[in-house]
Amino acid sequence: MSGHSKWHTIKHKKGAADAKRGKIFTRIIKELTVAARAGGGDIDTNPRLRTIVAEAKSVNMPADNIKRAIQRGTGELPGVSYEEITYEGYGPGGAALIIETLTDNKNRTVGEMRHLLGKYGGNRAAENSVAWMFDKKGYIVVDKAKTDEDALMSAALDAGADDLRDDGDSWEIVSTPDAFQKVLEAVKGLGIEPGAAEIAMLPQNYVKLEGKPAQQMVKLMDILEDHEDSKKVWSNADIEEKEIEASLA
């Protein structure tokens, strides 16, 4: 299982508790507002908004919450204005980090991110010093038990996917960001609900971490993801599943 897939799978198990605490709802509401402000409130003409609305529904966000968040983005309702800011850095063991945030106070967020990186053995890096190590891709994960390989491959490739990768118990479907929505709709058209579906920053190469650096990295990524301004955290760290689970316990 790839480093990205391992982290996502284990965090997904932990995600039920996060949802109860409202953390997932808070992030999605911010994303809905920003997407609507950037591209309008119509999901038929705003693919980014359509993807986030689908995610909101997948975690059972009430329709009224979704509607109000979109209306705050379009200006139909008053609300806080959020800014998208991406930070780059290094964690323990030299693993690279990309931290995507949505914030209403840039100075507060940059200070807190710098503090967290330093506290857990990392440091902030200059802009574009880390981003080049990653490729921005559409990323969909499908449980092998839920699908026929030939049918999935045919549907995904016909919809514009670049690759179908064998990842142990699952298939990873990779596409360009522009093709992502069409590929996702093709997968769902087979009656499959993906285990993950997102625009992801996928590492070109991984950095293997073990022992203390691995434990520190897991704790750092976990606390960064739990930060109220955090949207997504990406890393090229490759850590064994048992070490991730033990560090998150």
Language-model features: where?
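N-terminal cationic and glycine-rich segments that engage phosphates or anionic surfaces
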Residues: 1-125, 130-139, 208, 248-249
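Positively charged, low-complexity, intrinsically disordered RNA-binding extensions
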Residues: 139-249
